[in-house]
Structure formats: structure tokens, C-alpha cells
Amino acid sequence: MKRRSIKDLEAEIKGLKRKQHNKAMDSIAKEFQRKLYENMTPAELKFKHIAELKGIKLECQYRINIKYKKEIKRFYIVDFCDTINKIIFEVDGDYHNTLEQQKKDYYRTKDLQHLGYKVYRITNEQVYKGLSTALLYKVYH
């Protein structure tokens, strides 16, 4: 079975009824999640390892749907999520330094906070310098 691209799937969902729309969005999200999980960055893998050593259970590449009137309008896939405590950790690479990406990150963070999540951001460089241990300690103690 040939895999469809995310763009192909997005084109298919236009004009669908809510149930069909949500099913199509779910399909897109799962594919995107899978790709992100398979291609985690070295900094993300290091952060995950440190959290595991500290006994902190985090879901990797976790999807959060943004709904309006029960219809999925968009979704975010966050790097790490403590689903019990509603805590999100984002490991930011260099592309997060661009003004355009910073604006996207700002609105994404606001959406997630509106849903009750606490969002913590840490750069790749900070992970490599060992600051993820300090961040996890600060959040969980």
C-alpha cells in the first residue's frame, strides 16, 4: 500500500462532514507523529534519556488536538508531555531563533496554555550543557 503525503491527506479533508473530517485529521496527525518519533533529534533523545533516569514518565511526540464545536481545527505534536500533570517540554533547535518561528511558537504556547498545559522550552544547546536536569528538578520539586 502506497503511503500518501500529508499534503494529499490535507487536500482530501476539505469539505468533509465533521466525523469524516476528524477521521482524516486523525490520519494526518498519526502519520506526522510517526515521522517525528522516528526522526527525534539527538537533543530530544538526550532529554528523554535524562527524564527516564530521573523516573519521570513523558510521552514522546504527543499529539494535542485543538477543537471547535467538536471539530478538530488543528493539532500540535509536542516533543514531550507529562499527561497526568499537563506539563509540556519542547526542545528547540536553531530554527526556533527565526522571528517567524518565534511567532508560531508564541501562539502555539498560548493555545496549549489555554488548554491548561504548562509549557517549558529548552534549547538544544541547553540540553547539551546539562541544563535539562536543572529544568526537570525545578518543575518536579
Task: Map each language-model feature to its residues.
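Nucleic-acid endo/exonuclease domains
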Residues: 1-141
